[in-house]
Regions:
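Exported/periplasmic ABC-transporter solute-binding proteins
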Residues: 25-78, 82-270
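Bacterial N-terminal signal peptides that target proteins for export
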Residues: 1-11
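C-terminal motif of bacterial Sec signal peptides marking the signal peptidase cleavage site
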Residues: 19-23
Length: 270
C-alpha cells in the first residue's frame, strides 16, 4: 500500500510539474507593434522600455511619420498607430484617436542667430514669404532659409494649422523626420525650422513665441500656443491583442506619466 501511495504521489508531482510548464509555455510574449510619428520617438521609446521591464513584452517602433502610421493601423499592419496630430474627420470614420500626451512645437534657429523671439504673425509671414530677410525681424542681413517637414507629417500639420499657413508655406527643404530638421538647422546659420519640444537638442536654439518659451509648464497651461497632441490610434470596434491592450492601458496610466515627462512631453494623465 505504501508503495502504491508513493507511486501515486510521484505521478501527481509529475502531472503538476507538466501543467506548470505548460502554463509557462502558453504565456504570450509576442511584441506590440507601433508605427508613425517621428516626433513621438522619445515618448514611445521611454514607455516601451518601462513596459518591457515590467511585463517582459517588447514594443517595436517604426518611425514612418503620422500619416503613414495612421495608414498602417488602418490596414492592420501594426497594433497601434502614432500620430502627432488629431485625426481628421474622414479618418474618424474607422479609427479612434486617444491623446496620451501634449507636445510643444518649438521654433528653432541656429545658435549663431541673434534673433530670440518671434510672434505667431511674424512666423506666418516668414513661412509664406512676406518676410524674407532676418534683418526684418531684428537679425542679420541674410536671406531666411525655410526648413519644414514633408506632407503627411503631424508636426507640419500642427504647425501650419496653428499659424494659419496651410498650403502657403514656401519651404526651401521638406524633410522626413524631426531629427533631419534639427540637424539641418544646426548646420545653417540662416535657417529656421520647427521641431518637437520632446526632441530638442542643444545644437539648435529654441525661440520664444510672443515672449513665451516652449516648456512643459507653458504647454500644460496653454500659454505656449504652438502645441499639438500625441495620439495613439486604434481601429474602431476591433479588439487589440492582449499584449497591445496591456501597453495601451499602461501608456495612459498615472504610472506612465513620469516616463512621458522624462521624454520631454506633457502627460494628460497623472
Amino acid at each position: 500500500m505504501k508503495k502504491m501511495t508513493k507511486v501515486l504521489t510521484t505521478v501527481l508531482v509529475i502531472a503538476l510539474a507538466a501543467l506548470t510548464l505548460a502554463g509557462c509555455a502558453r504565456k504570450d510574449t509576442s511584441p506590440v507593434t507601433t508605427d508613425g510619428s517621428t516626433s513621438m520617438e522619445k515618448v514611445i521609446g521611454t514607455l516601451g522600455e518601462a513596459f518591457t521591464e515590467k511585463e517582459g513584452i517588447n514594443v517595436t517602433y517604426n518611425p514612418t511619420g503620422s500619416g503613414s502610421g495612421i495608414q498602417a493601423v488602418s490596414e492592420g499592419r501594426c497594433d497601434i498607430g502614432l500620430s502627432s496630430r488629431a485625426l481628421k474627420d474622414d479618418e474618424k470614420a474607422t479609427l479612434t484617436g486617444t491623446v496620451v500626451a501634449l507636445d510643444g512645437i518649438a521654433m528653432i534657429v541656429n545658435p549663431e542667430n541673434p534673433v530670440s523671439d518671434l510672434t505667431v504673425e511674424q512666423i506666418a509671414d516668414i513661412y509664406t514669404g512676406k518676410i524674407t530677410n532676418w534683418s526684418e525681424v531684428g537679425g542679420n542681413d541674410a536671406e531666411i532659409v525655410l526648413i519644414g517637414r514633408e506632407a503627411g507629417s503631424g508636426t507640419r500639420d500642427g504647425f501650419e494649422s496653428i499659424t494659419g499657413t496651410e498650403d502657403a508655406c514656401q519651404y526651401r527643404q521638406e524633410l522626413t523626420s524631426t531629427g533631419d530638421v534639427i540637424t539641418t538647422v544646426s548646420q545653417n546659420p540662416d535657417a529656421i525650422g520647427y521641431a518637437s519640444l520632446a526632441a530638442l537638442k542643444d545644437t539648435v536654439k529654441a525661440l520664444t513665441v510672443g515672449g513665451v518659451a516652449p516648456t512643459e509648464e507653458t504647454v500644460k497651461d496653454g500659454s505656449y500656443v504652438i502645441q499639438r497632441p500625441f495620439v495613439l490610434v486604434t481601429r474602431t470596434g476591433e479588439t487589440l491583442s492582449a499584449n497591445a491592450q496591456k501597453f495601451f492601458d499602461f501608456a495612459l496610466s498615472a504610472e506612465a506619466a513620469q516616463y512621458i515627462t522624462t521624454a520631454g512631453a506633457v502627460p494628460v494623465n497623472g
